Amino acid sequence: MRVDGRESNALRNIEVTPDYLMHPEGSVLIASGNTKVICSASVETKVPPFMRGEGRGWISAEYSMLPRATNTRNIRESSKGKVTGRTMEIQRLIGRALRAVVDLDALGERTIWLDCDVIQADGGTRTASITGAFIAMVMAIAKLDEAVPFAKFPVKDFLAATSVGVLEEGGTVLDLNYVEDSAAQVDMNIIMTGSGAFVELQGTGEEATFSETELAELIALGKKGISELIEIQKETLGDKVTARIKGE
């Protein structure tokens, strides 16, 4: 039994609140257990300088945490005057993952910014950010589609992320909270599409190694969790938008 009473193959309780903010074209509050992230999508009718005139769009992301999202206060990065390496890595990961399921040609010459702001952290902030940012992004694109329908809906597939790991006494587990993540012998983040394709695997042994059998178990757990997360995404977005993503 895990520290929070879950089975090894169970996600934390997932709650998604759509339209959480009034101004962005798309927004959600996603809660994964005690981890809570506000994800918002903003549409700009311009692209980065290196893409101007190509007729293609772009997806970019920024990630941040409230100073007291963790058990001790962190100094705001804006006060430090620079973004940390961890933050840069995470926001690049979010943008890269989302671009994997978007037809940038179909999007047209516009940028969609995803802002992922962690208001409470208990492990899995980057995976929750990706899962929530996907919903916010699709909401924004769906609003564009309602105003002037796309000849081809830009979102090609669903996308979600989760964590898996190996605990010293608990074996392989799905969706680690902070206590588990801190003590895990192996920690892995998995990003997958709705059709079962991998977008990214980030796996590391923490002063430990893992076998091919354990790797297979971790991937199987991740696939199960992501399948459940994508069903939640579909419920949140509704049948009409889900059908557009499927090309129906």
Curated annotation (Swiss-Prot):
Phosphate binds at R86, G124, T125, R126. Gene3D superfamilies: GHMP Kinase, N-terminal domain. One of its GO terms (molecular function) is 3'-5'-RNA exonuclease activity. It holds the Pfam family RNase_PH. The keyword Mitochondrion does not apply. Its EC number is 2.7.7.56. It catalyses: tRNA(n+1) + phosphate = tRNA(n) + a ribonucleoside 5'-diphosphate. It comes from the Bacteria. InterPro entries: ExoRNase_PH_dom1, ExoRNase_PH_dom2, ExoRNase_PH_dom2_sf, PNPase/RNase_PH_dom_sf, Ribosomal_Su5_D2-typ_SF, RNase_PH, RNase_PH_bac-type, RNase_PH_CS. One of its GO terms (biological process) is rRNA catabolic process. Keywords: Nucleotidyltransferase, RNA-binding, rRNA processing, Transferase, tRNA processing, tRNA-binding. The keyword Transferase applies. Belongs to the RNase PH family. Phosphorolytic 3'-5' exoribonuclease that plays an important role in tRNA 3'-end maturation. Removes nucleotide residues following the 3'-CCA terminus of tRNAs; can also add nucleotides to the ends of RNA molecules by using nucleoside diphosphates as substrates, but this may not be physiologically important. Probably plays a role in initiation of 16S rRNA degradation (leading to ribosome degradation) during starvation. Homohexameric ring arranged as a trimer of dimers. This is Ribonuclease PH. It comes from Listeria monocytogenes serovar 1/2a (strain ATCC BAA-679 / EGD-e). The gene is rph.
